[in-house]
Amino acid sequence: MLTTRFSILIFKMMKITVLGSGTILSGPVRKPSAFLLESAGHVALLDMGPGILYQLSVLNIDFLVPDTVFITHFHLDHCSDLFPYLMSRYLLDNGSNKRFKIFGPVGLHHWYETNASLQGKWLNDCKPDVIEIFNNNIQWADQKVLVYPTGHTNQSIAYRFEGQKKIFFSGDTGFNEELISFALNAELGVLECSHPDEKPVAGHMTPKEAGRFAQLAGFKELVVCHMYPENDTKELSQKLAMEYQGKLIIPEDLDVF
């Protein structure tokens, strides 16, 4: 079961815990981007890069409690802890993975089966429900979940959760006007903000781009994540505020919203 901090599982609105707000190069300060989502008695993970099992352990969260994981894309900094997590669940309860769902973009089945083929009986006999979602929507807990391609890779997707509150997770993406339309009027937007304005990298956003994205999308609150060390500076909030006029949050790992 969850610890006292997470003992009440019925929430009026989704509760979000930042498991990782950085990148694979962030060192001990920030783990790669990942989030714990809690809503209406359900618990899910959104992305599972390296170090996320450690974060769950720090929070004393029973590995069997989450029922779902949402994957944005297949780069290792967003999904490498998934199979260790499935092994942990199997060792705790060898039938538990049959009650677990993995949602992700087109290509999820191939990615999963390729990795599972190297693991043997423990995984192949206790397979979770692997579900590809693209240009359609699903239901999780009391949330309608929609996805949209980001262009970061051929398969990468962003997620939009619609319950009592609309919440948008960009995953990895560059500045994308079509994605802004998909994110429009979310109360909370969680955007990647990888590199400084003076060193832009294709497929990622700078503070100026993330701030502009949030302003055009009309977010009431902006949470930035996926910050490389060179962009994780004291000036980051000022740079974002030059474009975005709403409530700005630069989180620390394990912050709760």
Q: Where do the model's predicted regions map?
A:
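Ala/Thr-enriched low-complexity intrinsically disordered regions
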Residues: 3-4
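Conserved beta-strand hairpin/beta-sheet module of binuclear metal-dependent hydrolase folds
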Residues: 9-59, 156-171, 188
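Active-site neighborhood of phospho(di)ester-bond hydrolases with catalytic His/Asp-centered motifs
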Residues: 45-49, 67-73, 77, 81, ...
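Adenine-nucleotide cofactor-binding loop residues
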Residues: 49, 151, 174
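Active-site metal-binding motif and surrounding structural segment of the metallo-beta-lactamase
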Residues: 51-101
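Hydrophobic packing residues within well-ordered alpha-helices of enzyme cores
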Residues: 56, 82-85, 112-115, 179, ...
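Metallo-beta-lactamase
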Residues: 95-156, 163
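Cap/insert and terminal regions of metallo-dependent hydrolase folds
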Residues: 175-257
